[in-house]
Amino acid sequence: MLRATALHEWLMTPTVAQDVSTRTREPQHWAALGALGIVYGDLGTSPLYTLQTVVQATGGHFTTASALGILSLLVWTLIITISIKYCLFVMRADNHGEGGILALMSLVGANRFKGTAKILAVMGLLGAALLYGDGVITPAISVLSALEGVNVVTGSLKPFVMPAAVAILIVFFAAQRFGTARIGAAFGPIMLLWFLVIAVLGLTGIVRNPSVLTALDPRHAIGFLAHSGGNGMLVLGGVFLCITGGEALYADMGHFGPGPIRLSWYAIVLPSLLLSYAGQTALLIQKGTIEGNPFFQLCPTWGVYPLVFLAMIATIIASQSIITGSFSMTRQAMQLGWLPGFHIRQTSDKVYGQIYVPVVNWMMMVATIGITIAFGSSDRLAGAYGTAVSTTMLLTTCLLFTAMRKTWRWPLAVSILIAGLFLIVDVGFFGANLLKIAEGGWLPLTFGALVFFLMLTWRSGIDAVRESLAQASEAPERFVADLAAGKVPRVPGTAIFLTRTYQKIPPLLIDHVKHMGALHQSVIALTILFEESPRIDDEERCGVEKIADGIWRVTMRFGFVEIPDLTAALKRVKGLDPSIDLDHAIYFATRDIIVARAGSSLFAHWRLPVFAFLYRNAVKVVDRFSLPPDRVVEIARQIEL
């Protein structure tokens, strides 16, 4: 009884993230409208290609019973995976208001990458890396499926669909550097119009054949799987496309909070999707067999071109949400120490989450356009879609089980029961998507595996750098003794030494004195730490320790979603000498050169060149930490690994 009561209290207690709309003083219904434009682009445009893909998996011919079984699978996939798993459980696993698989990984303590936490870290990193894999396919399949709607009216435009898609994608990626601050406010209303249109179109199909509503009975889905044999797995692979955008609910939780995201899902998105799929199924039953896309065939001929235009806008919005999510996930991975520092530009001075990461943008553009040209159509591309995100959803469930046990302290039986239900569904879809590997499913898996390799290589290399610096540094006691004895000449001014190490006297400071023969009158040895929490309160941000006359050791902590401004943060530090002149301080940083040590480990032989390349091309400290470039001195240093 006590355990049941505790679970009830957990379900009824608001999370930190539910206060997001309250903190911004934005009414929940307006926040829900905003969520339509950011969170539900991918899920909302899935009716463009999902049922078409399923129809192809069945060979284009099916009975009324099989059509109802497929619709029932779509209905209950949306209910179990999105309505229950993500809306009720996964979104409860907020990391101080932030969501996403990397935030979940940090919540369960996997970012330490030690002991058994390594397994959880691998799950989180692999899940995040695979999202990049499907992220390069989403814009391609969405834009192609929208443009292919013109084939319903005339086949003469078919040769121009792929070139037009490539042109649109080039403009789309090229425009990312300008941000979406000015037009982003229109995303929500446009997607609201989209959902209303697909709901009305679905209703027109249902009116012709109301019997499709019986698909709400899950026995239709169970019966279909029981009697479809091996073809059922192929159909499941197509059905999965209706939820490929499910991770966005969790990833964008920090922007809107669970409340508005749930409100828009239950009130608008879910009913519209169900009506659209039901209407398309009614059309399939009516015709018995169908060629082309049932989504556009629901529309009267006079409305196809306007619908194609609206679908084009909706798919661009869906692609925008994928790109924005990739930028945000890249920043999280950087702050948590899993990726090198990339140049990040804030594209809005009002909305924190609107950022632009050039290297990610151009890499995704090249991959997306290459995929569009290679596959040429949405039906061929559907074979490559879903393999990566199905793996991510499976890994999310595994991490969710860990959160149930470690964070929420749930009983083992309850955790197994709930996570086990989700695992059954996830494993089923995972197995179905494995059948797509030969049809192109290898592509997002390979792309994700490459990102995963880069993440592990970077983290291993950075840990090796810290260990090498710690072993090579001189004893700080001798340096402090020389300072106390007046053996180190002091010159006027303030110097701030940026260091990765945690020693009280960092090697950079000692090397500076050794080569220059003097030290500034006021010195700050500064280490920047990125914590597993998304944000750090100002009163907890800095730790200050005076270690010698005129020398302070400062440790500054930031959350993994924060953009550090060191100059501004240092001015708020308490415990420093008031005479320190931060406005004219000189910042000292290193520009390290990575080389292989003779007889080094396997890491140096085959991964060191990769790490050295990443290290060499990482963003400079002056750019990452908003330092004044005319007051930064970089010192070259060779590090053997």
UniProtKB/Swiss-Prot annotation:
Top-level taxon: Bacteria
Coiled coil: none
Transmembrane segments: 31-51, 64-84, 119-139, 155-175, 183-203, 221-241, 265-285, 298-318, 355-375, 381-401, 412-432, 437-457
Signal peptide: none
Keyword line: Cell inner membrane, Cell membrane, Ion transport, Membrane, Potassium, Potassium transport, Symport, Transmembrane, Transmembrane helix, Transport
Pfam families noted in UniProt: K_trans (PF02705), K_trans_C (PF22776)
Predominant cellular place of this UniProt entry's protein: membrane
Reactions that this protein is recorded to catalyse: K(+)(in) + H(+)(in) = K(+)(out) + H(+)(out)
Topology of this chain in the membrane: Multi-pass membrane protein
Cell location: Cell inner membrane
InterPro entries: K+_transporter, K_trans_C, K_trans_N, Kup
GO cellular component, one term: plasma membrane
GO terms, molecular function: potassium ion transmembrane transporter activity; symporter activity
Similarity field: Belongs to the HAK/KUP transporter (TC 2.A.72) family.
Purpose: Transport of potassium into the cell. Likely operates as a K(+):H(+) symporter.
Name this protein carries in UniProt: Probable potassium transport system protein Kup 4
Native species: Bradyrhizobium sp. (strain BTAi1 / ATCC BAA-1182)
